[in-house]
Amino acid sequence: MAEVEIHTGHHDHSGDTFAQSVGVAVGIIGIILAVVTIGSHRAHNAAVINRTEENDQWSFYQAKKNRQQVLDVGADLARSLTTDESRVQAIVEKYTKQSAHYAEETKEIEKEARLKHEETTREEGRAVRLDIGEGFLELGLVMSSLYFLSKRKFFPAIGFIAAGIGTVLGVMGFLA
């Protein structure tokens, strides 16, 4: 039966402290990448939800405006179909009052829709920063990992710069 050899060193990196440092840095970059990716996904989801709520408000606004228009047309039609104003005065007053009520409601609905639009724009901006940060972190992870194949130190240098940019963009995305 053959004997099993157990190597305690990690291949040819056992004495290479720089490789160990790069390995730890790659792990840290991976953790930061995971956090930024989750933040990016959440920002995109929030933007979609806000956009949906904004669209709902605009649909509600349009429905109220349509009702207002129908009441205005009804009042005009009632006036035009009779020569006796006293017969339609109550109907016209009712329609005019309801139309004014819808006009007031639409102002508030429009205000809410515009606020949702601002929230959507803010979330979309956050998502873009986080997406770009995610891309730089991925680039940093890959470039740093190339050290293990090439033993060239400029790969981790480029990788750390890219990861630094990605981290800054990620932080900006979270703080926005």
Residue positions per predicted region:
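Residue-level detector of functional hotspots within protein domains
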Residues: 17, 24, 33, 118, ...
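Hydrophobic side chains within alpha-helical segments
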Residues: 67, 75, 134-137, 141
